[in-house]
Regions:
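Conserved GNAT acetyl-CoA-binding A-motif
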Residues: 9-20, 139-151
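Short amphipathic alpha-helix that is part of the acyltransferase structural core
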Residues: 46-78
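Acyl-donor-binding surface of acyltransferase catalytic domains
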Residues: 1-54, 175-176
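Conserved acetyl-CoA-binding loop-helix of GNAT-fold acetyltransferases
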Residues: 1-5, 124-140, 155-159, 163
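Residue-level detector of high-confidence beta-strand sites
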Residues: 104, 129, 169-174
Length: 178
């Protein structure tokens, strides 16, 4: 069971991802929660057709990690090193306008699509949807499942993924123990 596994694991890390509510009492048996980020997981079924984006995007380079971090709303939950690692390990997409990176998306270490962000002055132009379409197509070309984790109050992102045909799966959390 999970309790036995954690005892053998010896809490070598205090960070846990994809935690379901039933797991929390086991995780917190000897530790308190320092922070918890709760999200809803949505999947995109393989049968759902996704048209390619109308706007050209291209993969991001590891050197862009600091820029992405500086413009992230999740600096408390991530690091430049983590972003750099994700850029190296999996798919990413960026949109440049007049030489400026104005929107991007990449994946988390559970391979979920994430970090979707458009600079405020460029929002409302459909760039987020175009980035998401580009990421979905890249994941499918690699034969990988497509899923996202979104905070329940992020209605704009939820509306976007529902528009593209994602289906709710479950509530999960990222947890850091203290």
């Amino acid at each position: 069971d999970l309790f036995t596994l954690l005892e053998e694991f010896r809490y070598e890390t205090l960070y846990f991802a994809n935690v379901e509510e039933w797991m929390l009492p086991v995780l917190t048996h000897r530790h308190k929660i320092e922070w918890k980020l709760t999200t809803h997981r949505y999947y995109l079924l393989w049968e759902r057709q996704i048209d390619p984006p109308l706007f050209e995007s291209r993969p991001l380079e590891e050197s862009m990690a600091s820029y992405i971090y500086d413009h992230s709303a999740y600096r408390d939950f991530t690091s430049i090193q983590y972003i750099r690692e994700r850029l190296k390990m999996d798919v990413s997409a960026g949109i440049w306008i007049d030489g400026e990176l104005v929107g991007w998306g990449l994946t988390h270490d559970d391979t979920s699509l994430g970090f979707l962000n458009v600079i405020p002055g460029y929002r409302g132009q459909g760039l987020g949807e175009r980035l998401l379409r580009a990421l979905i197509i890249q994941k499918r070309q690699k034969g990988m499942s497509v899923f996202v984790n979104i905070e329940p109050h992020n209605h704009q992102s939820i509306n976007l993924i529902r528009k593209l045909g994602f289906t709710f799966d479950r509530e999960i959390s990222w947890v850091k123990l203290g």
